[in-house]
Amino acid sequence: MKFLDIRDTNFDMEFAAILARGEETGREVEQVVLDIIADVRARGDEALLEYTRRFDRLEADSVASLQVTEDEVDYAFARVKDEEIAALKLAVERVARFHEKQKQETWLSTGEPDILLGQMVTPLERVGIYVPGGKASYPSSVIMNAVPARVAGVGEVVMVAPTPGGEINPHVLVAARFSGVDRIFRLGGAQAVAALAYGTATVPKVDKITGPGNIYVATAKKLVFGQVGIDMIAGPSEILVINDGSGTPAHIAADLLSQAEHDELASSILITTDRGFGERVAAEVERQLAELSRETIARRSWETYGAVIVAGSLDEAIAFSNRIAPEHLELAVTNPFDVLPKIRNAGAIFLGHFTPEAAGDYLAGPNHTLPTGGTARFFSPLSVDDFVKKSSIVYFSESGLNRLGGGIVRIAELEGLEAHGRSVSVRLKGEGEARK
C-alpha cells in the first residue's frame, strides 16, 4: 500500500504504477485467443467439447448435453436457502424497477405538415451473457446483465458460464430463472465468446455479448467486436473514496476491502484531506484483512494497488477523482450532495457515510456493470440502452420534397455527388413520370 501526498512533486510518478495495472494484454494472450476463435469458427461444437475437456475438465458427448435443463434449475432451488432465494428475488425486482425508468419509446415528430421525422426503438433479437465462474460465483452478474435485457424486450437471452467439474453454482441458476434467462450452457472462456459470436450447430449466434470475465474472455470480446456488439472491455475492479475527515475509519476500510477481495489486480484508493484519518483507515485495513476468508487475494491487491492519498483540499481531491474516472466513487464526506455536481467522471457514485459500494453491487437498483480503467470519461454503466438499437424514420410528402429539395441538391452538388442530387431533382421536375 502506498501512502502518498498529492502535493508532492513525485506524486504522479509514484501513482503511475497503480494506473498502469492490467494495461498490457500481451501478444501471447491475444494469439491464444485468436487461435481459439478460429478453431471454434472452423470446427464448431467439436472444438467446444475439446476446450471444455481441456480447461474445465468436463467430459461431454455433445454440446447439447452441456445445456442446463429445467430440472437442474428446479434442483438448484431446492438446494438454496429460503432467505437467499428471497434476497435474489428482491434484487431482481429492484434492478428491474430501476431499469424500467431507462426505457425509451419510439417517437414521431409532426411539427411540419408535410414531413414526418422520428426514431424507432427496437430490442435486439438475441443476446449472450457471460457469467464468470472462477475464484468466486456471481449470481449478481446474472441479474445485472439479464434483467436490463429483459426490460428492453430482448427476444432471447442465452447465458454461458464456465463450470470446472460440471456444476453451475445453484445461486447462479436461481438468479438466472428470476432474471428471465432462456438458455444456459456450461461453457466458458474465449471459446464460449466465440460460440456466441459466430454460432455453432448447438449454440445460437447472438447480436451482442455482455458480462465480465478473465483476460481471455475480455480479449475474446474485443476481437469479436464488429461481428457482434459488446458492452465494454472490463478491466480489474476499482474504488476511490473521497473523504474530508468525517465518518468512521472502520467503515471506509471495509469499503476499500470490498474491492480488494475481487482479485489481485483490484485497486482500492482513499483520498482524504485529513492525514490522521487516512492513517487510521490504513491501520483498520490491516486489522480487517486478517478476518477475511479471501485474505490472500485482498492483501495482494491492497499491498500492490492500494493507496491512501492526502489532498490539500476537497476540491483537490475532486479534481483528482475526475482525472482518474473511477469505476466506483464514494463521497464519504459531510455534505455529499454539495460535492456531487462537481463530479464529472465516475461509473457509479455512492453518497454519504451509509451508502457502501456493496449496496450498488447487489440490490440498490442501478447496474453494477461499470466502466473501469478510466473509461468512465466516455463510457456509461450497462443499461437498457445496451439492449436496443435505434433507427431514424424519415417521411417526405411531395410538397415537403418540393419545399426542401433545392437545398438537398445544392449540398449534393458542392460535395460532387451528382447522382445524389439527381435522385431529388428527378422528382422535382417530374422526370420519369412519362416512362411509368
Swiss-Prot record:
Enzyme Commission code: 1.1.1.23
One of the record's GO molecular function terms: zinc ion binding
Uppermost EC category: oxidoreductase
Pfam families membership: Histidinol_dh
GO cellular component, one term: cytosol
Domain of life, source organism: Bacteria
SUPFAM superfamilies: ALDH-like
UniProt keywords, alphabetically: Amino-acid biosynthesis, Histidine biosynthesis, Metal-binding, NAD, Oxidoreductase, Zinc
Cofactor: Zn(2+)
Protein family membership: Belongs to the histidinol dehydrogenase family.
Function per UniProt: Catalyzes the sequential NAD-dependent oxidations of L-histidinol to L-histidinaldehyde and then to L-histidine.
Protein name, as recorded: Histidinol dehydrogenase
Organism for this UniProt entry: Geobacter metallireducens (strain ATCC 53774 / DSM 7210 / GS-15)
